[in-house]
Regions:
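Low-complexity, intrinsically disordered short peptide segments enriched in small/polar/basic residues
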Residues: 15, 35-37, 50-52, 56, ...
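Conserved glycine-rich acetyl-CoA-binding loop
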Residues: 39-57, 66, 77-84, 88
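C-terminal "cap" of GNAT-fold acetyltransferases
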Residues: 69-72, 76-83, 87-89, 95-118
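Short, charged, low-hydrophobicity "junction" segments
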Residues: 62-69
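Residues at secondary-structure transition points
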Residues: 6, 28, 32, 50, ...
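Acetyl-CoA-dependent GNAT
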Residues: 1-45, 56-58, 62, 99, ...
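Short glycine-aromatic motifs
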Residues: 6, 90-91
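Residue-level detector of beta-propeller blades
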Residues: 17, 92-93
Length: 118
C-alpha cells in the first residue's frame, strides 16, 4: 500500500501475514532529511525469531533508496522489549519525548534515531 510519502510493507511466512511496518518521510518539521518508522508490528509467536530484524532491514533499505539521511521512530517509554530491540539494532535514544493519548490515557513516547544510513 502506498500514499504520498507513506509506505506499508508486510512480512509473509507460508502465506500468512505475520508482520507489518509503515514508514516514510519524518512527520516533524526539524527532520526534513529523515525517514520515520511510524509503526512496526510482528505477531507475538514470531517475536525473537529474527523476523523483526528482517522487517527492520527491509525498511531501512527502502528509506536508503528514498535517500533519507537519518531514521527516527517513536516508541512508548514503557515498551521496554521494543526499546531493547531498537537499541540492539543501533538506534540511539534522543532527548525528544512527546506525550500521546491512547485509550484516554496519557503516555510518553520517546524518540530514537539512527544517523547517516547512507
Amino acid at each position: 500500500m502506498e500514499s504520498p510519502g507513506l509506505y506499508t510493507m508486510v512480512c509473509i511466512k507460508d502465506g500468512e501475514y505475520i508482520g507489518t511496518a509503515s514508514f516514510g518521510r519524518a512527520r516533524i518539521d526539524n527532520c526534513s532529511d529523515s525517514g520515520e518508522i511510524i509503526s512496526i508490528y510482528l505477531l507475538p509467536e514470531y517475536i525473537g525469531k529474527g523476523y523483526g530484524i528482517k522487517i527492520m532491514d527491509s525498511v531501512i533499505n527502502e528509506l536508503r533508496i528514498h535517500e533519507y539521511k537519518d531514521v527516527i521512530l517513536y516508541v512508548l517509554e514503557e515498551n521496554t522489549r521494543a526499546r531493547k530491540f531498537y537499541e540492539r539494532y543501533g538506534f540511539e535514544l534522543c532527548n525528544d519525548d512527546k506525550e500521546v493519548i491512547i485509550g484516554g490515557k496519557k503516555l510518553t513516547a520517546v524518540r530514537y534515531a539512527i544517523r547517516d544510513i547512507q
